[in-house]
Amino acid sequence: MQLLKGSERVTITSKAPGKLFIAGEYAVVEPGHGAIVAAVSRYLTVTIDETTSVGTLTSTQNPDVVVEWTREGELFRAKGEHPYNLVEKAILVAEQYVRESGKETFALYSLSITSELDDAKRGIKYGLGSSGAVVVATIQAVLDFYKTPRTSLLVYKLSVLTNLRLSQRGSFGDIAASSFGGMVYYTSPNRSCLLEQLQNQSIKAICDADWKDLMIERLPELPDFTLLVGWTGQVAITDSLIQATEKKRKVETDSAFYKEFLKKSHAIVQGLQNAWKTQDIPALQEGIRANRALLNEFAQVMQLEIETPALRTLCDLAEQNGACAKTSGAGGGDCGICFTPNETQRQQIETQWAKAQIQVLPLSIAEAW
């Protein structure tokens, strides 16, 4: 954070990393069920510059769009329709928290967004969680602008409440990774409880309380277990895949499979959590492979395409070279991941991926906050 002296205006800069799911996909949308999620070394940055006339919202993703906003009392009010609904809601939630903490929110500012998570010039999305990162970075910047103390957990909670107010689906594991950085073990909160609390409690009261079923635990770095990420060139639509799963689940007359899937996924993820803590590489490899097999079984029963032909090739080539691999996130496109214990193996996989038209993304695990 940069504060300019005297009558000079305040400038704040905040960044949030992208994410990749390592294990636990689909099951983690259920409260209390776990996933391993990594923050990765590409970032979305939000800059706030104090102004005295009219506020603006801008982004390198939409360079021709400038949204003006003003105040109604202390409340943020955008002028007209615009593509920044997530950003607007994040500002509203963060500023409500600031006011409930005893501070005023009369200031005007220009908020600008720059992102490394997508390739705006070529119109390419890599599936690195830009929607979660923009909410996290915006909330961090607004809290810093008003000199309101923050923790990673507070930023996570405010970001989740932002998404719930927009009826967003998903586990919010991307938000956990962007808020905490590094690698985390994550179980999702009970969204029904939070939605009920939003009807009759203040934002600050909700954030100050413990959240049912939520757990976020940082996991240690594993220098001898390197993450390698391949991008297939296909774009996955996470929300659509989750909705399809929900519809299928609702019409299932026998939910025994789904219950068993949740049980198996939770056991695999807990095993990975313990293996990360003890740096047990063979157990980590076994867990990644087990999760891949479970997700493929889940996809077959739920009539989903999680592991596309390109993702299957990505995983199989990694496995043929002795690495463990799987899809990352909802599947159906975007990225696959593998973990390699040595440089020779990594180079062999990268070469074979390139021959199969799979692009290696130069990513590493982002620093924990």
Where are these regions (language model features)?
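C-terminal nucleotide
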Residues: 2-23, 27-29, 37-105, 118-121, ...
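Short glycine/threonine-rich catalytic loop with a Thr-x-Gly-x-Asp
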Residues: 128-130, 324-330
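Alpha-helical scaffolds flanking conserved acidic
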Residues: 108, 152-156
